[in-house]
A protein has these predicted regions:
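Surface-exposed interaction/ligand-binding surfaces
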Residues: 20-132
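Sec-dependent N-terminal signal peptides
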Residues: 4-14
Length: 132
């Protein structure tokens, strides 16, 4: 009898961990290096259960100090596994007018009031060499 109770408890613990791992947040940048004034695309991608609700970060005109947002595309939603899962992609077009190495901290996405974070990114901005 005790073995059955222990087995049931273990099944509940394992199923809770499986459900908790069903959300992934990933961030990518298409160019690690750009020249001043060039543009790069930052992509924030969330994979989750179709019944969950996602709230993406609300940026206005800057991603971080020195990195300006040129455009925020509409989120692209794809349904997977017979509409059981969703993949939502949000794309930000960014630029910079100062040469530096910019650290883009992890971006947070709220899924059913719980925050999940992406990995941090870096963007190196070079100045144009002057011809003499």
């Amino acid at each position: 009898m005790n073995k059955y109770i222990l087995l049931i408890v273990l099944l509940f613990l394992v199923s809770g961990r499986i459900a908790a791992q069903s959300v992934t947040v990933d961030a990518k940048i298409d160019s690690l290096q750009i020249l001043i004034g060039e543009q790069a695309k930052v992509q924030l991608q969330v994979a989750m259960d179709a019944k969950q609700r996602a709230v993406f970060p609300s940026f206005t005109d800057t991603l971080v100090r020195g990195v300006e947002i040129v455009d925020i595309a509409k989120p692209d939603t794809q349904y997977l596994n017979d509409r059981q899962r969703m993949l939502i992609t949000q794309e930000y077009t960014v630029t910079s007018f100062d040469s530096a190495l910019y650290y883009i901290p992890p971006m947070g996405v709220k899924i059913d009031n719980k925050e999940y974070k992406s990995k941090a990114l870096a963007l190196k901005v070079y100045s144009m060499p002057v011809d003499t």
